[in-house]
Swiss-Prot record:
Keywords: Cell inner membrane, Cell membrane, Ion channel, Ion transport, Membrane, Transmembrane, Transmembrane helix, Transport. The lineage of its organism: Bacteria, Pseudomonadati, Pseudomonadota, Gammaproteobacteria, Alteromonadales. HAMAP family: MscL. The chain crosses the membrane at residues 9-29, 79-99. Channel that opens in response to stretch forces in the membrane lipid bilayer. May participate in the regulation of osmotic pressure changes within the cell. GO terms for cellular component: plasma membrane. The keyword Membrane applies. Homopentamer. This is Large-conductance mechanosensitive channel. The keyword Transmembrane applies. Gene3D superfamilies: Large-conductance mechanosensitive channel, MscL, domain 1. Belongs to the MscL family. It comes from Shewanella sp. (strain ANA-3). It holds the Pfam family MscL.
Amino acid sequence: MSLIKEFKAFASRGNVIDMAVGIIIGAAFGKIVSSFVADIIMPPIGIILGGVNFSDLSIVLQAAQGDAPAVVIAYGKFIQTIIDFTIIAFAIFMGLKAINSLKRKQEEAPKAPPAPTKDQELLSEIRDLLKAQQEK
């Protein structure tokens, strides 16, 4: 089998396509959450904390020299990233919880007992006849 045919067989499997769609949607969701945190959540928190802009919070390790930019630890951006992660992780948790709940409901649904086989029906009839003879 040629490499191209193998790749087509691999890529056309449902799981690979589902995974690709999930990755694309996840990346888009990550951008939405990042914007939500940076543009909607953090400004009011900054105002509450006395006009702090979290994007600018940093510790300067070495000042800018000539063309070289300053070396900084940007802990404000790190705080925003932690909030991004927390929101995304919570959304994933809630989604998985809903999926697992649906799976449990499907698993818990009582299955109809299997119909007795012909052998079992014959044995039941023989048993009933023997009981009837013993009662006489």
